[in-house]
Amino acid sequence: MNNTSFMILGIFILTLLGVYSIYKPFLLSLSVAILLAMATYNIVNQLSQKLNSRLAGTVISTMMLILILFVPMIYIATSGVEYISQLDNTAITQTVDMAQKLLQKIPLINEYAIDKINDDQIAKFVEQSSAYLATAGKAGIGFAKNMFLVLLFYFFINYYGVAMFNFIKPLIPVSEERFQRMSHEVSSTMEVVLYSTIVTAIFEGFLFGIIVSYFGFNGLLFGIIYGLASLIPVVGGAIVWIPVSLYAWSTLDSVSAIIIALYSIIIISIVADTFVKPIIIKFIKEKMLHSTVEINALVIFFSIVAGMSTYGFWGIIIGPAITSFLIAIIKIGVDYKAMSDT
């Protein structure tokens, strides 16, 4: 490299650092928008072809994303707060007492229940919760801002995506065939993860909403909450149905609480999550998306856990995307090695 090349490289690196410093606050939202655009690329293309307009296809796909992301959050933020404010405080206290008695009967947890679930700890928890609720508005505004940026970037990436791709294509240091295969691997994984996550969350939330509405609870509200909770690995919907069943025990009767608990365990956790969910994923993968990419369910599970622990809510999308991108890069490296050996 001559002096001119070094100078150009240095200017390029400085420019990248400057761009990074300017756009750093938007990198997470931009990354999520790019991944969502990759996951919905086929749908946007089909809509654009049927409507004979890229703008119309982009607008409709963005509106669908708003319906899926924004509407449930707004409903929880409005109806959820109003519903919680109407709960019976006496019943809540009875529910906590009941939980304490139940935990004390479990050998390995009884000492923890005595130390952590008592009047002093509950009072401390209420005080901390009040402080959290006081700042929840700021957090909610921040999340809404990030979601708005994701939707904004998503719209422009879909609308100008082809032009942007053609602009950066000459800079990609791999052949077009390998790049197409790598992007197909990542986008196919994102499609399966995104669509199966949305469908199973709606399905499980619908099942829980039916049972709680039968016993007089707000089925739509708790269905949405349960659907979002089901996205959390390991614990999932248990963080919803356990408090609801205990509250039903205090306000209704023991039979209602047992029915809610058994229904949540047997119908949702065992039947729906264990047996129906794989069928839904297989149907989406083979019949709807016609994807041939083999996805290890365990790898996807741990990538979602790691993604959520690092990036929070958006980790559901970022975790599998980064993992699938790594796998695609490794496959390209293996191909290069095989070519060099021959």
Question: Would you name each region that the model predicts?
Answer:
Residues 43-46, 50, 73-149, 161:
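Juxtamembrane membrane-interface segments in integral membrane proteins
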Residues 44-57, 163-187, 283-292:
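Membrane interface segments of multi-pass transport proteins and intramembrane proteases
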Residues 1-75, 327-342:
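Anchoring transmembrane alpha helix of integral membrane proteins
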Residues 1-5, 118, 191-195, 227-234, ...:
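Short, amphipathic, aromatic/basic-enriched membrane-interface segments that mark the entry/exit
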Residues 25-32, 214-224, 253-260, 295-296, ...:
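Membrane-water interface of transmembrane alpha-helices in multipass transporters/channels
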Residues 142-251:
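Alpha-helical transmembrane segments and their immediate interhelical loop/hinge regions
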Residues 258, 263-342:
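Hydrophobic alpha-helical transmembrane segments of membrane transport and translocation systems
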Residues 8-31, 129-167:
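Hydrophobic alpha-helical transmembrane segments
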